[in-house]
Amino acid sequence: MSSSAIPVLEDLYPVTMDMWPIEAREFNRVHPFYENLKAGKLTTTRCRACGAASYPPRVICPECYSEDLEYIELPDQGKVVVFSETLKGVPLGFSAPLIHATIDLGKDSPVRRLLTRVMNCPAGQLKEGDDLRLVVFEVPSHPIEKGKKGTILSERVFFAFEPVTRYSRHLQENLIYPHS
């Protein structure tokens, strides 16, 4: 089989191995989650029938099977409960260290704990109890076929959390944001 049979995105990885969700409204019933992320908000769904909130966002309530769900905002900061760092054998499309953490979003959050990726943190620096904040980042887009209507190119984002440093905490508290 020739190499041209496998679609490649900018020679980074085969599209057939794309680990990011297709976020377009036409292909995803939880597309409001991604629209909210584009606005810098981490959200999930809560059932209007029974009040259950669950993460990740759902299209059917896992408690009562209702489809009457609403999007609610989750905190954009949390504390590290436990974490793991992968330094070798990191999956294609990621770089070391690949850090995942269970974070506590606080007692008032509708979803108490969340498993997330941690970015912008050198290996060996993260500690249990560290404060983290939401970071939204762009992920590669690729053409999505829509049958006879052609293709679309969907802007895509995803989220992770990053350590809150004294410097970034100072910027947030004083509403001073660096300009690029």
Question: What is each PLM-predicted segment?
Answer:
Residues 83-89, 108, 123, 139:
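Short, conserved beta-turn/loop elements at beta-strand boundaries and strand-helix junctions
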Residues 92-113:
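OB-fold (S1/OB) nucleic-acid-binding surfaces
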Residues 40-43, 57, 74-76:
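Short metal-coordination and nucleic-acid-contact micro-motifs, chiefly zinc-binding Cys/His arrays
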Residues 113-180:
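Well-ordered alpha/beta subsegment
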Residues 46-49, 60-66:
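Short, cysteine/histidine-rich loop/knuckle motifs that typically chelate Zn2+
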Residues 78-81, 118:
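Conserved hydrophobic positions within beta-strands
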Residues 55, 68-70:
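Short functional micro-motifs and their immediate structural scaffolds
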Residues 1-42, 145-154, 158-167:
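A broadly conserved sequence feature marking short terminus-proximal activation segments
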